[in-house]
């Protein structure tokens, strides 16, 4: 009779899964490849793909600490405001975070060509304008801050700055009056400046004229860029035209309330307050290659024909970029 084979009871403990069970105890399953059992391997894989998810408790704690510090600064007055009213602390901790759900989840904004924006130093961003309300300007401002850390100082119409609450918040978020003096002042201190030459003609145009650029005025933004010797970055925003499609403009009511237009959309005023909810269109913002003005010299700002031609060049770049991206997108909402 052959000798029986003796199986040792302890020939080395098999490796156990590195995960924990739902009640916080160590998992007793045998570990497979990667140190996790078959049950917990998918969860570990998800954490590897999204490392911030594993740090979520720490992220929440960090956010709470930042908000407490913010509250202390507001109560003690220990926060800077520049001489044009820009409150960086309020903007970064309150105003921009309020816009992020719209940017990330509602309009799902994609940005192209952010690398064309200089990391520092003065730059003039020139964009199309649309959407009934100037939300496109806010999305551009937020997108650039989140990807570059730069604050874009927007030039706003006097009407926007005169509105109660809105005007005050506009000033605190770094915006200023659309005039040459303020624009040059900001550029000469190294700021990124955003301008929308179409003005109310662009943001309040009917839906049938969507993505057709209106006049760019007399080229005031080009004169500013030439006098400051800064690059111009053309910006094309696709998606804002669909958030409040204007089907009619009640001019008598606009005159009565002192507004540039009184829009009628498919949902406003038909649905009352619900008509103020923008439609969830899919957005794309593209930043074109900079147009360098330094070599032209400041005296070029006094040449009306040169200013007109450069204005037309910037406008044409934006218009062609809009057409290109409209052709490429599958649907206004996806």
Language-model segments: what does each one mean?
Residues 47-91, 185-334:
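Non-catalytic C-terminal accessory region of glycerolipid acyltransferases
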Residues 14, 108, 122, 151, ...:
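A residue-level signal for beta-strand positions that form part of recognition/binding surfaces
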């Amino acid at each position: 009779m052959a000798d029986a084979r003796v199986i040792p009871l302890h020939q080395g403990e098999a490796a156990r899964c590195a995960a924990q069970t739902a009640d916080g105890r160590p998992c007793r399953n045998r570990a497979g490849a990667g140190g996790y059992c078959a049950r917990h391997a998918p969860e570990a894989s998800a954490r590897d793909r999204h490392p911030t998810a594993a740090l979520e408790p720490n992220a929440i704690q960090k956010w709470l600490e930042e908000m407490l510090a913010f509250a202390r600064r507001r109560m003690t007055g220990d926060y800077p405001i520049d001489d044009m009213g820009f409150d960086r602390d309020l903007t970064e901790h309150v105003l921009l975070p309020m816009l992020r759900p719209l940017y990330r989840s509602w309009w799902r904004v994609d940005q192209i060509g952010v690398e064309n924006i200089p990391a520092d130093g003065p730059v003039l961003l020139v964009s199309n304008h649309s959407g009934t309300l100037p939300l496109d300007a806010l999305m551009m401002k937020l997108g650039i801050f989140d990807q570059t850390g730069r604050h874009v100082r927007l030039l706003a119409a006097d009407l926007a700055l005169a509105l109660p609450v809105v005007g005050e918040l506009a000033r605190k978020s770094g915006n200023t009056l659309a005039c040459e003096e303020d624009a040059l002042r900001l550029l000469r201190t190294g700021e990124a400046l955003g301008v929308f030459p179409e003005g109310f003609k662009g943001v309040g145009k009917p839906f049938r004229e969507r993505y057709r650029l209106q006049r760019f005025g007399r080229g005031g933004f080009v004169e500013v860029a030439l006098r400051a010797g800064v690059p111009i970055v053309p910006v094309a925003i696709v998606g804002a035209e669909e958030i409040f499609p204007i089907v009619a403009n009640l001019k008598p009511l606009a005159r009565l309330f002192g507004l540039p237009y009184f829009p009628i959309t498919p949902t406003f005023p038909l649905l009352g307050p619900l008509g103020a909810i923008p439609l969830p269109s899919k957005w794309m913002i593209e930043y074109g290659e900079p147009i360098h003005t330094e070599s032209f010299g400041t005296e070029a700002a006094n040449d009306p024909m040169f200013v007109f031609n450069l204005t037309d060049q910037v406008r044409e770049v934006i218009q062609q970029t809009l057409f290109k991206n409209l052709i490429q997108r599958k649907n206004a909402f996806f």
